[in-house]
Curated annotation (Swiss-Prot):
Keyword Isomerase: yes
Catalytic reaction list: 1-(5-phospho-beta-D-ribosyl)-5-[(5-phospho-beta-D-ribosylamino)methylideneamino]imidazole-4-carboxamide = 5-[(5-phospho-1-deoxy-D-ribulos-1-ylimino)methylamino]-1-(5-phospho-beta-D-ribosyl)imidazole-4-carboxamide
Phylogenetic placement of the source organism: Bacteria, Pseudomonadati, Pseudomonadota, Gammaproteobacteria, Alteromonadales
Compartments in which it is found: Cytoplasm
Record has Glycosyltransferase as a keyword: no
This enzyme's EC code(s): 5.3.1.16
Name of the featured protein: 1-(5-phosphoribosyl)-5-[(5-phosphoribosylamino)methylideneamino] imidazole-4-carboxamide isomerase
Family indicated by similarity: Belongs to the HisA/HisF family.
Keywords per UniProt: Amino-acid biosynthesis, Cytoplasm, Histidine biosynthesis, Isomerase
Pathway: Amino-acid biosynthesis; L-histidine biosynthesis; L-histidine from 5-phospho-alpha-D-ribose 1-diphosphate: step 4/9
Catalytic machinery residues: 7, 129
One Pfam family this sequence matches: His_biosynth
Length: 245
């Protein structure tokens, strides 16, 4: 599945290089028009990252996201700055289909597990941003990549499998925003090890060949941001490569 994505800072469409707020590119685009274009080209799921909220949860762009959800028919997955159950339930109440939870799953796993039990495993996607060290360990970063986490991807998957983990978004931080291609070995490894999880691949997608490579790796979906914004290819072309299931 092709999952077009936009990142938002104070209502503007942006891209960060490797999660660094100091390496930001701003695009002179309307978030709604951009997402409508992706919807019209056949996207079955859209992905929005609230980067303002990720940095400061008090400044989450909930009203903007609510207006986008109202105007679009396609299901929307939203991440960025969700730290409390109230914030999670607010997003679900305004019509967001699935909420992405990142750092909190590492920092407060028991709390996040309770949300899986209460809201169901379809309502939550874990975002696992990994740094692969020299030993090949997949260490999950926390706090918008601004500090290390210490837990491995495998240990987190084991922990959340007990509450029915179904959706996980995995980014190899070293590839994000680089257009250097996805880490297909990573996706092949985890989709083989945990076939029950719908893995969303993210980071580094530059060409349709990259899209095809991720599809072949066994991932269930691919999040594409920058490549679409700079017209490397279209959503329509990507779906031709990887038809929606």
């Amino acid at each position: 599945m092709i999952i077009p994505a936009i990142d938002l800072i104070e209502g503007q469409v942006v891209r960060l290089y490797q999660g660094d707020y100091n390496q930001k590119t701003t695009f002179n685009l309307s978030p709604l028009e951009q997402l409508q274009s992706y919807q019209e080209q056949g996207a079955d799921l859209l992905h929005i990252v609230d980067l303002t909220g990720a940095k400061d949860p008090m400044k989450r762009q909930t009203q903007l996201i609510a207006s986008l959800v109202r105007e679009l028919d396609t299901p929307i997955q939203v991440g960025g700055g969700v730290r409390t159950e109230a914030q999670l339930s607010e997003l679900l109440e305004i019509g967001v289909s699935r909420v992405v939870i990142g750092s909190l799953a590492v920092k407060e796993p028991e709390l996040v597990k309770s949300w899986f039990v209460k809201y169901g495993s379809d309502a939550i996607c874990l975002a696992l941003d990994v740094n692969i060290n020299d030993q090949g360990e997949k260490i999950v970063a926390v706090s918008g990549w601004q500090s290390g986490g210490g837990k491995t991807l495998e240990s987190l998957v084991a922990e959340f499998s007990t509450v029915g983990l179904k959706h996980a978004l995995v980014t190899d931080i070293s590839r994000d925003g680089t257009l250097k291609g996805a880490n297909t070995e990573l996706y092949q490894e985890i989709s083989t090890a945990y076939p029950e999880i719908n893995w969303q691949a993210s980071g580094g997608i530059a060409t349709l060949a990259d899209v095809n490579a991720v599809k072949e790796s066994g991932a269930n979906g691919i999040i594409i941001g920058k490549a679409l914004l700079i017209n490397q290819f279209t959503v329509e072309e990507a779906i031709t490569c990887w038809p929606n299931a």
